Amino acid sequence: MEAAVAYYEATGKDKLLKVMEGMAGHIIDRFGPDKLPGIPGHQEVEIGLMRMYHATGNEAYKKHARYFLEERGKNPAFFAEEAAKRDWNHFGMVPKDIKYNQSHATIYEQEEAVGHSVRAVYMYTAMADLAATEHDEKLFAACERLWNNMTEKKMYITGGIGSTVEGEAFTKEYELPNDMAYAETCASIGLVFFAKQMLKMSKNGKYADAMERELYNGIISGMQLDGKRFFYVNPLEVNPGVSGEIFGYKHVIPERPGWYACACCPPNLVRMVTSLGRYAWDEDDDVIYSHLFIGQEARLKKADIKVVSEYPWKGHVSYSITPKTGDEFAVAIHIPGYLKSFEVTLNGMRLKENSETKADVFYSYRDGYIYIKNKWHDNDVIEISFNMDIRVIYANTKVREDIGCAALQRGPVVYAFEGVDNDDDVQSLMIDVSRLNEAQIQTEAEGILKGAVLLDIPAVRLESSDALYSEKPPRQKSVIARAIPYYMWGNRGLNQMRVWMHTIYN
């Protein structure tokens, strides 16, 4: 159904769409009240039905998406009962684990992100789409509870979700191991689906911030830079000889394979990258919303907008606006939550915030967006400028694996340290956060990392004797440690990698 809608939207041809209308009609005829009871084992049909509704306007599709969503959890034993009727079970399904498939409670009663992470965020996506479409405040509140729990207590700094290989699932709050992380690529993609639907209901910058975190880190890390190899799992620490080999770590493959049996992530990643325009913009009656600093030419209802972006390496983005009518409308641009200051200009003139400036044009700031209301003319240009400082990030101390450690970010990009840049050993490095002002920013001039911004960070390497245990503390050697964008790791052969680094304060 999703493919049929995508093809219809891209080409205007409805042949496949009509085929899938027949399929959707068959689903509606077979399942529902006074018919076969049932809910999807993997929550994708709900997304498909909602997309079919948006494409065709057929209310039956939306109504049945609601049925499937609201039926879940009414009988937590549904999948176990179904499995007992036959002598086989679908690969990967755990019928008796009612949290695995989010059937432990109704969608309105669920307080915590649990179970199979992809199933969960796909279900949340359909919930949020339905809530926004029908302006359902109760359903949106349920989505908001799940969003907050997931992003505030169960998400890696890279945007990865679903921390355990057991059931490809969420675990306990703050349980975010780095070297055993699962963080499936599809789960990160699903979180972007969810965020986009939440933005339809509430223009809050936290949803766009999450999309940005995923797109520059936890999603594109799933594909090798040449596009030929892929990760299913996205760890935050890798140690060859342990990762991929020892029990408990076998799922953490230290190099991207060419393919794998469950090949959901590669095509999902490709469709995400090729459909970024859907996630970058929204449009209401009197506002155009820009959620992401992505260079492109957008053809919208009120205007054509050309975006020229130097993001994420430099802090400069411009919007050239060609209005289609003479009406006054606002352009709302998301300002990333990490920015402490920024400058906005219109046709070279600096804009100030709020109307107290008595200027003809100004901007207002609300929930992570700047709003510029104007009667636009051809080739009016908005420019956003800001500094791109290196930021030291610390985890909540409830994340026990990260106590005493720090991670580095610049802009939206999370950084990682690889052995190939650091004498083959990142485990004995301690970055000196007190000397961060001495850090050097380098733009790689050649090779597979060409064009990327790399960081050279003052650090200390610990060196010990051969003894397993000793009363003598390790020797400290001052070094410069190099960090690369996390999404680029694993492109230069088998080696160590680490995001959260031990720190030293001099």
What kind of feature is each model-predicted range?
Residues K18-K35, H64-A80, M93-K96, C143-T158, ...:
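Long, well-ordered core segments of solenoidal/helical folds
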Residues D129-K153, L176-K228, N239:
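Catalytic-core region of carbohydrate-active enzymes that cleave or remodel glycosidic bonds
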Residues K15-L16, G57-Y61, G73-Y100, K138, ...:
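Proline-centered turn/helix-capping motifs that create local helix->coil transitions or kinks
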Residues A65, C143, D209-N217, G222-T322, ...:
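C-terminal beta-rich recognition modules with glycine/proline-rich loops and embedded aromatic residues
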Residues M1-A24, P33-E71:
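Acidic/aromatic-lined carbohydrate-recognition and catalytic surfaces
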